[in-house]
From Swiss-Prot:
Induction: By stress conditions e.g. heat shock. Belongs to the heat shock protein 70 family. The keyword ATP-binding applies. The modification Phosphothreonine is found at residue 175. Residues 588-617 are annotated as: Disordered. InterPro entries: ATPase_NBD, Chaperone_DnaK, Heat_shock_70_CS, HSP70_C_sf, HSP70_peptide-bd_sf, Hsp_70_fam. It comes from the Bacteria. It holds the Pfam family HSP70. The gene is dnaK. Acts as a chaperone. It comes from Rhodococcus erythropolis (strain PR4 / NBRC 100887). PROSITE patterns: HSP70_1, HSP70_2, HSP70_3. GO terms for molecular function: ATP binding; ATP-dependent protein folding chaperone; unfolded protein binding. This is Chaperone protein DnaK. Residues 597-617 have a biased composition (Acidic residues).
Amino acid sequence: MARAVGIDLGTTNSVVAVLEGGEPVVVANAEGSRTTPSVVAFAKNGEVLVGQPAKNQAVTNVDRTLRSVKRHIGTDWNVEIDGKKYTPQEISARTLMKLKRDAEAYLGEDITDAVITVPAYFEDAQRQATKEAGQIAGLNVLRIVNEPTAAALAYGLDKGDTEQTILVFDLGGGTFDVSLLEIGDGVVEVRATSGDNHLGGDDWDERVVAWLVDKFKAQNGIDLTKDKMALQRLREAAEKAKIELSSSQSTSINLPYITVDADKNPLFLDEQLSRSEFQKITSDLLDRTRAPFQAVIKDSGIAVKDIDHVVLVGGSTRMPAVSDLVRELTGGREPNKGVNPDEVVAVGAALQAGVLKGEVKDVLLLDVTPLSLGIETKGGVMTKLIERNTTIPTKRSETFTTADDNQPSVQIQVFQGEREIASHNKLLGSFELTDLPPAPRGVPQIEVTFDIDANGIVHVTAKDKGTGKENTIKIQDGSGLSKEEIERMVKDAEAHAEEDKARREEAEVRNQAESLVHQTEKFVKEQREGENAGKVSEEILTKVEAAVKDVNDALAGTDIAAVKTAVEKLGTESQALGQAIYEASAANEAGNTDGAGNDDDVVDAEVVDEPTDSDKK
């Protein structure tokens, strides 16, 4: 049976976990780290770098390095590199492919299936796009699971049969969620969820960048935002400062040679940022987490005093101001410190993968839809069929009728959101039910059915009860990809994987060739100038040198087959050289033996002749 993994595809970092003997294990990547930066870079030589290698070269390759792409997933955003446009799904797929590759290296077997997590407040288009990213990466996405739900699953599964209420406060690199869940007797049920898809650690970093830019401009009159390379260095320094301020009261931000002045003199940036100043310039960001928290308490109908455990998820919750706020909101309750906020979501995803593959028994995960779903009816009103925080999977139907006499068709427009006017909500998609028989208005019976699967992905059907005619739409946002596009991207990704493999093989061949050339040149020099000089004929040495030249000429070109051929030829000539050296040495030893007579050293001479004696046996 193929192995399944759990993947936390994050805005800034991603994690993969797998079940080993029923226990979840976080897999370290090829670089030895348990978290992989969600960064993809297109190097000038055509190589695609993912993770830490991509992050390391970001300063010198700003325009071709992509980060925080998760913020764009489910939209029509794209980026053009070397004349080719890439969607967020394709870029995210690169990160997923690396995680898949690292997990396969760890397990020693292929991985085909995965559970991928998304922020609880992700809309339908964002969920659909995440699933597409998995497909492009060559994964069968078993389930899309909400991040707080996965975290609660990882945290609460070993807490016994007693029913408990868990608040998950999830502040990642680019998104924020807060969820209230009940866990007991193997059932994990989400009671309510809320959040902000555009709030995360990146925003804290940008505030520090803006603060540094203002300080530098005041001192030097130069706007660093105009310099892409300087801006990238500022972002990296801001992230580092934010992390340091989680454990220190102040941090030094020192960037030498950040730019030059009008006279081409180098300028340096050197600032001290205190924790209090950092909290001051980011206080409004922190305040944005309050409303979703209050909404969850209200929607769930559970009082703050009845919350048993508070779990912090996401690296951004390490900021002291965040944990202080959570303590304040929960009436002084201390957040649980027993989980790793960076890894707990991937661990929960691996457990859910185990549930779906039958490796983990007696666990039921009941998730909810984060936003209400409905259609636009007469007057532009949003008529909700499924209210937010409804447990999924679910199916709801409602019957509508026509607004005009002899209306030949009805347009079904599907919206997601909480506003009373449909146009103020997010349009997920629309379709038409046509060829309705002529009838007075109010007579036709149009049954609209909403069906949300366990991934939170919506299917809508409209059916004319009179004729039985129906039309169905699987909600696919304007940014959604067709089946053909996904297949094309899968092939592109596979081809790129082959390219990467070929590039690695080429590098190995070149390295071996260069090493062989170096060793052979050294060997030839020793035969000409060393203590054994003159023992091998010049003809053999000349042939070896010619073969070395052929390898060097091939290395200067791009034909890897020519390099292999030249290396084989050099190998043959090197063997001939080795044989000549051996024969010369043997002849020399034999000469020494003949000249020794009946000297006492004759015993030693017999040792040299041993191979000849053994051949006779």
